[in-house]
Structure formats: structure tokens, C-alpha cells
Amino acid sequence: MSSARPHWLLPAAYCLILFTAAAAAAVDEPHGYRLDDFRAHTPATLEGATVVTTAEAERLWRAGSAAFVDVLPKPPKPANLPAGTIWRDPERQDIPGSTWLPNTGFGALQPALEAYFQAGLTAVTQGDRNRALLFYCLERCWMSWNAAKRALALGYRRVLWYPEGTDGWARQGLPLERRAPR
């Protein structure tokens, strides 16, 4: 009995793996905001916004032609810390010159957080709804997608979404700097 496999079997298996991976990574835009499982594959598009690559984000950053908005959540202080424990917020490294508006990328915002988001955008755009706003957080993070969608709903007309976020930025050896929330 021959143990030889048909010559087409290995290439066919390889194609099946590639097709399955591509299908798993293809994500449709939801009708509303993403409400859970924020660290997952994101859509390739955001209706009404421009999706930018790292190279495009770098050009915008160097030209100063967009306000960069980081929406990565700020980790809360653990409620069960032993008495006397000193809590230090984890350091956030983001794109130089950015404004960090933490927690504003969740799918549903409480009124106070919604007001904070609106005030933050008004501050970085000086009230100009035509000012380009670039939203980011981490790669495979729905927070920036939600925040960009929310900015569109608020009437901002030049919304950019950078899905690679600080992960893609750092991979290219571009600078990051420590940031505190606005």
C-alpha cells in the first residue's frame, strides 16, 4: 500500500487555511456601536470616515493637518487593593501631540462621559467641525472605531480612523510619548 498523498492535497489545504483566515478576519460594519468584545478584529471601513494607514497617519502627523485623538480606556484603580497600597496609573504611550480622551470609545456612554467626549473634541478642534480628527487606540480595538463613528454622529466632517493605532505606529519605529488624560 502506497503512503503517497495526491500532489494537490498540500496546496489545497494551504488555500483552505488562507481562505478560512481571511473569512474570519473580514468583519462587517455593525449598524450601531460595538458594545462588547472590544479587542477583536475590526471592519476595514467606517462609513463616512477615511481609514488611514500608518504611512498616511505619519504624513498627517508630520504636517500637523489633523488632531490626533487617543481613546484607549484608562485602567481603573482596583477596588480590592490592600490598605496602604500606593496605586500608580499605568503609563500610556501615545502618538506625540495627541489628546487622550480615555473611555470614550465604549459603545454606550453615560451622559457625563458623552459630555466629556464632546468637550474634548470641541477643545481640540477649537469648535471647527471641518478640522480633521484622527481617532486611534490599539490594533484590533473597536474603541477608536466607535469614537470615530460617534464624532461623525456629532457632525464632524473630516473624521479619520487609524485602526493600527499605537501598535502599528511603534512597529514602524515612530515616536511615542507619555500622555495623561485630558
Locate each region found by the language model.
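Rhodanese-like catalytic fold shared by cysteine-dependent sulfurtransferases
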Residues: 18-55, 60-63, 78-134, 138-182
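Short hydrophobic beta-strand that contains or immediately precedes a catalytic carboxylate
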Residues: 57, 67-72
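Glycine-rich nucleotide phosphate-binding loop and flanking beta-alpha elements
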Residues: 75
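Bacterial N-terminal signal peptides that target proteins for export
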Residues: 2-12
